[in-house]
Amino acid sequence: SNILVFNKDNDSKICDLGRSACLDISSNFLTMRYTGDMTYSPPEVWYRFFEPDWKKRTYAIDCYMLGSLITFYFAGVSMSALILSKMPNQYHYLVWTGTFNQVEEYLHAVFSEVIQEFERNIIGEFYKDELIELVKQLCNPNPEKRGHPKNSTLSNDKYSLERFISKID
């Protein structure tokens, strides 16, 4: 439901990454920590990490959502579902009472396992390595480390999706 196919040539576009919000338009969603379906939310939401900068928080989540959509397309399950399926119970967000920083190393360990599982679901060697790297950059469990490495020096565009979309296109 997130990919629209337009014609007999199968031209397609990503159509939805969650509930939309814009700083220039008044909305009840602007004050929410996360506006989407919790089933697909990124790890920082589960563990109550809150980035006060709206743009930074929202764009980091957008990165994760795009990576999760790509994961779903190839693995048949979202990144969030994969991470939670491998998370040891004592570190599951419903049980965990510590901070996001305290659970981060466990998230990264599980993320490594999930990436290996994702890799096994990609058929075809032509784009496999690039696709894996793309998902790693988009879905890093630490929102501060998400995004394309070439964007890391661009303070306003750290989470820009343009480089990723160019790769996918």
Please state what every model-predicted region is.
Residues 1-43:
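Activation segment/activation loop of eukaryotic-type protein kinase catalytic domains
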Residues 22, 37, 69-73, 134:
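Conserved hydrophobic scaffold of the eukaryotic protein kinase-like catalytic domain
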Residues 39, 43, 61-68, 129-133:
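A structural signal for well-ordered alpha-helical segments within the folded catalytic domains
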Residues 43-47, 75, 140-143:
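Residues at helix-coil transition
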Residues 48-124:
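Conserved C-lobe activation region of Hanks-type protein kinase-like domains
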Residues 125-141:
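Conserved C-terminal C-lobe helix
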Residues 139-153:
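A conserved short helix/loop substructure at the end of the activation segment
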Residues 152-169:
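Regulatory extensions appended to serine/threonine kinase catalytic cores
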